[in-house]
């Protein structure tokens, strides 16, 4: 079973002036293109791994307003993408699961261990596992999150990299990273392999 997690940000969005001017597409075209790329990617995976479940949680780049304090959690362009992907994959036996209005989604491994997927806008990697364990009232085995655009692991959390690397905004804040993704393999009995896949064009 492959659990494919889409932790966002797949849209440049409208939250930073620099990324608006840097984007070569408006937000609507970004939604269509990102959705099509995700569908194509999932279908490529299915050719190699027949049993796939996909999980979507939205991030901060899809906010419908620039001001963070003005943004309601559910007012997010990225919520459109799983609906589009679900419709495109309806003739396949691929599950498309999203958190609805919540910015996280959960699933369990074969041995019953709880995994929480979240973008991470509202979380810190050092405390997120403890906070979700309290929130859900259940022991969380691992948190998988994005947002920080750099691979990190520890304290019951794995931070995924970004497929785009650094944009003008992140460079202006002196953040830098290589485009990368994380592949985790659960062998059983707490034996877990974590692989950092550095992306090159």
Residues covered by each model-derived region:
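Core catalytic region of metal-dependent phosphoesterases/phosphodiesterases
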Residues: 1-88
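Conserved beta-sheet core of the metallophosphoesterase superfamily
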Residues: 46, 75-79, 84-92, 97-101, ...
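Short, solvent-exposed loop/turn elements at beta->coil junctions and helix N-caps
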Residues: 104
